[in-house]
Amino acid sequence: MGFHTFDADDADRLERASVRYRRVSAEEVVGPLAGDGAGVLADLGSGTGFYTDDVAEYADTVYGVDVQPEMHEYYREKGVPENVELVASDVSDLPFADGELDGAFSTMTYHEFASPGAVAEVARVVRTGGRFVVFDWTADGDGDHGPPVDERFTADDAVATLEAAGFEVDSASTRTETFGVVARAP
């Protein structure tokens, strides 16, 4: 399961607000992160910066982390907010110090990096008590949209992986095609 990467040639599809916000609203991502004063955050799998832009309004700094340089190129052409810094990196080897981030989020990209090692890396870089917000396609969905079902995870899978890395899960929910998990770093 997992490790499906979105085709950068189709990056325009990631900017369709009417479609994306039906799956995950900006408020669902921003709310858990802005509640404690957002500070320094990382968008893991930032792509074109669609959700990065929403969160940037409430944060001092947001690192847009993506493994595909083409996604950063698209984002630069679109326009990157002043408080967003683009970082080319795999989630399993993040270039941040221990506890450097006040929080992190991943919208529809968890399946691209969801290994115990990558989640442990997120736990390393997010300060104790900082939130990690995950929304992704669920393996319980029909697969009409998003990655193939056999490359997805369930909310229970994500909770188990996060808890194994020391995260304390605040909430987990499943919808028709997506799941959401909000957790706090150890």
Where are these regions (language model features)?
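Conserved class I S-adenosyl-L-methionine
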Residues: 1-36, 50
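A short glycine-rich, Lys/Arg-flanked "PGG" loop and its adjoining helix->strand segment in the class I
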Residues: 117-131
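A short SAM/SAH-binding and catalytic strip from SAM-dependent methyltransferases
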Residues: 102-116
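C-terminal alpha-helical "lid/dimerization" subdomain adjacent to the S-adenosyl-L-methionine
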Residues: 13-20, 131-182
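A short acidic, Gly/Pro-enriched loop at the edge of an enzyme's catalytic core
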Residues: 92-103
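Class I SAM-dependent methyltransferase SAM/SAH-binding core
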Residues: 42, 47-93
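Conserved acidic residues
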Residues: 39, 60, 102
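A generic alpha-to-beta junction signature in SAM-dependent methyltransferases
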Residues: 34-35, 56, 113, 126
